[in-house]
Amino acid sequence: MNIIQDFVPAGRRNRPGKPNPMKYITIHNTGNASKGAGAKAHAAYIKGDAAANVPASWHYSVDDSNIYQHLPDNETAWHATDGNGPGNSQSIAIEICMNSDSDLLKATDNAAGLAASLCKKYGIPVENVVQHNEWYPKKNCPQMIREGKPYDWGVFRGRVLQFFQG
């Protein structure tokens, strides 16, 4: 699994720099179906001026062919809509790209593989791979998975387990 490290500069509002004990992995969909809105585009956005003063960040952007890492895993990200709660302060955030010119099945499988790899690396139980909705029930995220596209949450967790055991 090739991960392109392209970190948000230290000291910016969207890189809080607080320690993250890495107890969970939170799965998101980007909410951006625009053509070209893959992992590279999201990497450019999160590092760009438009996001510099926005309290929103995540660790990984995943599409059908690339994985970009934006923050070190052991740093907090602002992604779970729970303030200083465990979603933000204790989890690694994975954003699955849903751009219309991408293979959503491949992107979602790539995210499941990444989640499994992170579970192994940090001793995170597969049961602690959760939806954004877990931290903020009003948020329909990961939207595509919650709608069964390309498959539902049970299948996603099963794919994480398959990659973990494989």
Spans of model-derived segments:
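N-terminal catalytic cores of peptidoglycan-degrading enzymes
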Residues: 1-87, 149
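Basic/polar, cationic surfaces and motifs that engage anionic cell-wall
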Residues: 1-9, 14-23, 96-166
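Cell-envelope and extracellular/periplasmic
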Residues: 30-31, 76, 87, 92-101, ...
